[in-house]
Amino acid sequence: YGNDNIMVKAGEIIGEIAVASLIYDVPAMVVCSHIKGHIQAGYAGAIKNVAMGGISSSHRHCGWKCGRGAMHTIGEGKLIWDEEKCELCLQCEEICPLEVIKFENEQFTYREADCWRCGRCARVCPEGALTLPGDDERFMKALAETAKAVLSTFKPNKVIYINFLTEIQPECDCMPAADVPVIQDQGILISDDIVAIEQAAIDMLLKAKPLPQSAASELGEKTDNILYDLSKKPYLIQIEEAGRLGLGSRQYELIEI
């Protein structure tokens, strides 16, 4: 929710991004990431955590366009409300973290300038009455660009990553409710290479079978890509782009301890 930040060069898509001042100033960092699914990223791990967790939601002067909104949206990214589908359940109004959504005389309104385009309202709408335009490939590459921007504020070998492959949910932890984990706990990974640890985590997830009564249970033996089948998002792009940007290597060696 803060706007105490410093603009840092990112990449071709993002340009510059508002990195949180405290992260910018500290000499080292331990990145603890709970592995789970994600409405936009498909897979949410260390890259998503650094990219979204290391920047501000908005900037004092350019608002959401210099913060998380720069990743969440393409163009202006205006919310679209379909009145015919809307049943006035008000779930979108209740979940909005900034309380920008209101219904007046049964008509949807929101303070566009204050909205940071997180997409939670669209996600919880049971009828699909709210949509937020986006571009999957752009979003994945923007995640990698922003992660690089955040990590560029540290000297080499000053960041370590811990991925928790436990209680693996189909949704982001920012959602208001938890579900049955989609697979059994797989363990905890630690590395100083953000790309390697992400690739290792994904490989472990793809080898696991869906748990009964979870969002993935209907996939059963039919799936060999549980992450994609749950989200329909090309999640590997973020890993590939992070590697292309020089953040690490997809090659790794697993050492059990």
Language-model segments: residues:
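Extended, low-polarity segments enriched in aliphatic/aromatic residues
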Residues: 1-257
